[in-house]
Amino acid sequence: MKLSYAICFSVVTLILLISVGMTQQIRYDMPFKTTFNNLSPQAKAEVECLAENIYFESAYEPKQGQIAVAFVTLNRVNSGLFETDICGVVKQKIKNVCQFSWYCEDKPYRISTEKRLTSTPNSLYNDIRDLAVSVYINYERMIDPSNGALFYHADYVNPGWKNMKMTAVVGRHIFYNRTGKGI
């Protein structure tokens, strides 16, 4: 009797562990799929800005880290605290400081070169742009790996932010949200 109880308990525990583990997976190949070429001109422009931000902020991070960076960008769009479109958020300066450091480092002018260098069908930039399309069209149906973050930084810098609550660590990025008012 004790043995069958222990086996039953172990099976239930295993099922619970598996189900908990499965909820932690982040899907980026959501059921609503389209290609970049099928988007409207306005959506293409927004996706390009999102892809550039993912590329320059997290190109060599795990896929979940790239998705988390995309979510911070889209969380800002929907927060009411930043610009109301993706390109505006990516290019926004607050107190003459770029919100995404790559944008102030002349990289926007290099992106066309980056695209040309990576024009093969399986290039890193094209993979990231496909990811950006997927997140763009499925944002409201996806799990946010940043847990609602509006800010992040790489783990090798210390910005000294105050009034920030850490929401997640994904790859080499640490994600935060505000605890008070203002940005």
Regions found by a protein language model. Name each.
Residues 21-183:
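Bacterial extracytoplasmic/cell-wall-associated proteins, especially those involved in peptidoglycan
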Residues 1-5:
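Positively charged n-region of N-terminal signal peptides that target proteins for export
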